Amino acid sequence: FIRAAKIYADFSSFDVEEAGRIELEADYTSSEFNTLQELEFKNDFGKLIIARINSLRGRGDYLTLKVGTLFHSAELDNEFGLIRINEVMPATQSIKINSEYTGVQLGISPEWEFLHEIDLEFASLKSSLNLDYKIQRTESTKKYYQGFHLNENTTNSLHITSEFGSVKLTSNP
């Protein structure tokens, strides 16, 4: 178990089984974590795989980011890559994603109550969730959606801004 650490890695690969708080700066690196409390990262040209995490925050370029289960929050900025979170748990408070040329895929618990704001330019939204829309605007190259899932008075939130990428929200039972 690593309680807290700063990891600097270039042209590498490594695995961490269990950790509390990690700060990661990596380039051209494949990083894999099994269970994490908190990760803050800057990662270019690589792969970051996390099985289970509470809080995730970071920035990547040409990064493939795959998360198994998210329990609390994520704040992500990615260009030219993939962001995939297989399971967003009902206790998650916030997800904020800003992406360019990046595919975004979120598997969301059907019990997660959240407000959503999704702003797309040259991008698309596909959702199998029963989202309620208060605002829904579609222009030739821009799309904007604002509303909620299950409870319009919740404080939980999902904010996605995407340019030149697809956004896919699926119900994950």
Regions inferred by a protein language model and the residue ranges of each:
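Intrinsically disordered, low-complexity terminal regions
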Residues: 1-173
